[in-house]
Amino acid sequence: MASTLISSLAVVLPLTLLAPSMSMKISRIDVLGYICNNGTVSNEEAYRRSYQINLDAIRGDMRHVKFGTHEHGDPPERMYVLSQCVSDLSSDECSLCWSRATDLLSQCFPATGGWFHLDGCFVRADNYSFYQEPVSHQDTKICASDKEKSAEFKGLVKEVTKSIVEAAPYSRGFSVAKMGIRDLTVYGLGVCWRTLNDELCKLCLADGALSVTSCLPSKEGFALNAGCYLRYSNYTFYNERGLLAMSFTKENLTYIFVISMVGVLAIAAGFWCGKCFYMRTSPKKKIKGTKTKKFHLFGHLRIEKESESICTESHLMSFEYSTLKKATNNFNESCKLGVGGYGEVFKGTLSDGREIAIKRLHVSGKKPRDEIHNEIDVISRCQHKNLVRLLGCCFTNMNSFIVYEFLANTSLDHILFNPEKKKELDWKKRRTIILGTAEGLEYLHETCKIIHRDIKASNILLDLKYKPKISDFGLAKFYPEGGKDIPASSLSPSSIAGTLGYMAPEYISKGRLSNKIDAYSFGVLVLEITSGFRNNKFRSDNSLETLVTQVWKCFASNKMEEMIDKDMGEDTDKQEMKRVMQIGLLCTQESPQLRPTMSKVIQMVSSTDIVLPTPTKPPFLHDSM
């Protein structure tokens, strides 16, 4: 049965048809990526009928305006469909691309829907109104296998994508760019679905720009987002003839519009000249106390426009304060998710229904200023499925705001250390959290060369499926190539920061900073997840006891099972849990050289074939034990 071909797929499958020829030029009707939803409908026949009715309703629009939306059916199985062609395609090319995409999407059913990204068009169907979604956790990127490692090429790609991000939202959601230097030329194209407003379009393309620039030094990069598509290449892939036709049509319309408005403008000009003459001959009143609009930002006097560059330079959306105020009902206490060292985190709902998390920071002095700059700088450079997505920022004279994606299950500590909620976390979910956090840290250490410095349960956010995302990069530091330690002499005592109970001993006592301090914090987190106890609030007869030392004692006396969280039930794989606890102990060894890298941790958690070494004593354990 055709419907079983690709049903029940919950992950993006990029370039299924294209992957073998990624080094070759691709066709505009080649499939770049697709997804079929996990959920299924109860009445497949009726759902397919709704799909066909929706397609029939937008067929004419696709040929004439290359875009269409329609919905049909009764909730909860009402179907919503959106499809759009890239503007440079001709009507015939659009029809061909759309026909192929819709045929392929029909194979998803009885899933509740899915989407197909072709190079020249996009189609999506689902059982809810998704039209205002700019980004999604299912967004993906594709990077070509061919490389161009010159610095000039990288610079051109960044300039081309930046140009598209800035131009497309104000050009009906579509823009192309071309830049060259000597024998190198980069071509780019960006398109937003027409249901997005300018702000959401820019947000989507900015996110796409981050994705494709992380492909470098690949010669081609593709960003497949929920609300847009962005591509760069080293050859002309778009239809220049189609662009000329678009330009000709626009010029004709502009000419007609200008001619028709000349009379109106002439009359308006007459009124304006009269007003200017009156103002020049009238007595002038001096208004006292007027000044250029400036404000204090991070303890420094800056012009408002300059503050916005902090966002725009990182390809981030600059949110209006009024938008965030409305989204949180004037930062109502009922919207507050938590409180941190420099402010609070609120849940917000934008006018299109999209939920966001807003970190409001009360800034005064250099330290919080540096942390805000640092957080924006770090997270805007890094993109991974296990790192929280930064959407944008906002600055006022009193506060600064960082806007993130909202994750429904908030932070791990809210669930893990709650006697009732922790029962939601079976071993499968906890293992997923441990592995996902390790993968996020591996990406930070190996790809971004970043040390997080504050890994703990409250900085691990969970989505609806309990998949983890590392957050709060205010203390993160870049470290040298090769993973060498940052010299302690370069760190002032005040710059040694983190959370007691999670900080590695060599960092506390000597200021030695390497990626092994994250390994230590991760090890503490692993022991918390497997035991259900909080490390710095662990209770025992010995007031100096910590969770880490207690687990090590149980390991040494072959009583590890006593430390396993009983709330996971009797069906838990005790052997696997004890193995993961041992990995936690390996990460919390006193000697940083003995702690495994995150790559090794992932291997040890994923494969039981790897024999684990015996962990040495953790720090702060008295020899009298």
Curated annotation (Swiss-Prot):
Keywords: ATP-binding, Glycoprotein, Kinase, Membrane, Nucleotide-binding, Phosphoprotein, Receptor, Repeat, Serine/threonine-protein kinase, Signal, Transferase, Transmembrane, Transmembrane helix. Residues 331-621 form the Protein kinase domain. Residues 29-130, 135-237 form the Gnk2-homologous domain. The gene is CRK46. It is an enzyme of class 2 (transferase). Its EC number is 2.7.11.1. The modification Phosphoserine is found at S458. Disulfide bonds: none annotated. It holds the Pfam family Stress-antifung. GO terms for molecular function: ATP binding; protein serine kinase activity; protein serine/threonine kinase activity. Belongs to the protein kinase superfamily. Ser/Thr protein kinase family. CRK subfamily. The chain crosses the membrane at residues 253-273. Residues 274-625 are cytoplasmic. The modification Phosphotyrosine is found at Y404, Y507. Residues 24-252 are extracellular. The modification Phosphothreonine is found at T499. Residues 1-23 form the signal peptide. The keyword Methyltransferase does not apply. It is found in: Membrane. This is Cysteine-rich receptor-like protein kinase 46. ATP binds at L337, G338, V339, G340, G341, Y342, G343, E344, V345, K359. Glycans are attached at N38, N127, N234, N252.
